[in-house]
Structures are given as structure tokens and as C-alpha cells.
Amino acid sequence: MFIEVENIRKSYGRKTIVLNGASFNAASGEYIAIVGANGCGKSTLLEILAGSLKADGGSLKIDGIDAFADALVFQKYIGFVPQENPLMEKLSARDNLKFWYCDTGRNMDADLQGGVPAVLGVSEYLDKRVDKLSGGMKKRLSICCALAKNPPVLILDEPGASLDIVLSLIHI
């Protein structure tokens, strides 16, 4: 697995340039941290890399495939936990997971017993509505949803927000 990000550009209107040539490469097994001041475009870059925001220019290739030309690349290769909670608040944790597990071919019930949901402590909260969960539990559930399709690439925006330090250090 190899990711090539080249000259990503994004602006809002004519005067607000958010990204002006972001570039990097990443190989399988590498961790990349995007660091910068508030408002410098970190979240914008991550949203573009996850396929939820369109870039004005540049290229993103995953294993040589142009992700901007084929939106299915994002679905196949990338799991994304955005900064803002992506969960369906009025549904239970279980129903949120079911939504993300559909069409994956994976056994959600087996994962609940010994997979990521069990490791992150989500399994005991499955029947609670998301709007009744703590911020930390919502973040854990969001991570489980992003990992439902077992993507080779996981993008986390503000990964430690709402999580206690011990859980933040667990390597999945």
C-alpha cells in the first residue's frame, strides 16, 4: 500500500486559500501526523484525503490508482473519523455499527465479541442511544464504525479528543 499526495490545493472563494500545494508520500505501516496552528487547513486536508471534500487541484493516488477519478477508491481503502461526530444520534450504538457493517461481508456479532468494539469497550453500550453516550464513548464508537470495513488506511482528525490518555495509546 502506497499513498501519494501531490500539490493538493483548496480555497474558499477567491481570497481564502486554505491549502496551497500540500504533498507527502506514505507507505504501508507508516503513521503520518499533520501538525499546525488552528485554521491552517489540517482538517480540510484530511477531509480531502478521505473523499468527503473536493480539492481544487492536485492528485491523490492509492496504490497507483487516481482516487480523485474513481470515488470507489475512497470507499475501498479509507476509513475516516472526522473531527465532528459523524454518528446518527437518535439511533443506538448497535444500529450505528449495523449501518457501517452493511455490505462489508464481515460478521459484526463476531467483532463485538473479540474485535475492535470489544477492545475499545463499546460492546457494553450497544443498546444505548448515541445521544446518551459520553464524548469519549462517541469517539470510540466512531473509530469502530470507521474500521467496520477493515480499511487499509485509517484517517483520524483530532484522534485524542474526548479520549482518556490510556485509550489514546492503544494500538489497534
Feature-to-residue mapping (PLM):
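Helix-to-loop junction immediately C-terminal to a conserved catalytic motif
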Residues: A50
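Conserved ABC transporter NBD signature motif
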Residues: G58-A69, V73-F74
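A short, flexible loop at the N-terminus of ABC-type nucleotide-binding domains that lies
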Residues: M1-V5, R9-S28, A33, A71
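Conserved small/polar residues in nucleotide/adenosyl-binding loops
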Residues: I170-I172
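The feature captures the beta-strand-to-loop junction immediately N-terminal to the Walker
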Residues: V35-A37
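Catalytic Walker B motif of ABC-type/P-loop ATPase nucleotide-binding domains
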Residues: L154-E158
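Conserved ABC ATPase "signature" region
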Residues: K98, M108-Y125
